[in-house]
């Protein structure tokens, strides 16, 4: 009795090693008029939002925004106040994708955030944003799916 395995081929994507890019961004922001002056900054917190990614000619372009929330003690009243502001994030990883990669997943995080007061109405924000791009290339997966002449040889599939 000679049996042969039937192989089936499936289209899939193969994940390649991730590409990590860290970018530092700094900007000055004016405290909105509706907020009281800053006496002392208590804490700043940031969250990265990746909005889009484009893949073309071996490069990945990522765009998004960094949402920063600042908690501070107001001048005069001494009470805690907060306000949020948004910083744009644009990054291009040029020439680092293997040829044939047509898809990629992008994730990111804020690895460091520093907010300090330059004066009671102006703050300096310095943020390090880490982007991780995992490229995917089209691939084929071959797996055994059945046995030839199963019925003739009395083979049962469970």
Stretch-by-stretch model annotation:
Residues 1-158:
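Viral structural modules
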């Amino acid at each position: 009795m000679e049996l042969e395995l039937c192989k089936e081929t499936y289209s899939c994507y193969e994940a390649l090693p991730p590409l990590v890019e860290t970018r530092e961004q700094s900007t000055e922001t004016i405290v909105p008029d509706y907020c009281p002056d800053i006496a002392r900054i208590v804490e700043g917190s940031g969250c990265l939002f990746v909005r889009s990614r484009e893949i073309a000619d071996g490069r990945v372009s990522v765009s998004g925004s960094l949402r920063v929330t600042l908690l501070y003690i107001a001048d005069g009243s001494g009470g805690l106040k907060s306000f949020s502001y948004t910083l744009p994030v644009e990054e291009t990883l040029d020439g680092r994708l293997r040829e044939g990669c047509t898809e990629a997943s992008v994730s990111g995080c804020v690895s460091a955030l520093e907010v300090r007061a330059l004066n009671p109405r102006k703050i300096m924000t310095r943020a390090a944003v880490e982007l991780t791009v995992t490229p995917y290339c089209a691939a084929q997966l071959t797996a055994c799916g059945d046995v030839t002449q199963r019925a003739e040889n009395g083979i049962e599939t469970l």
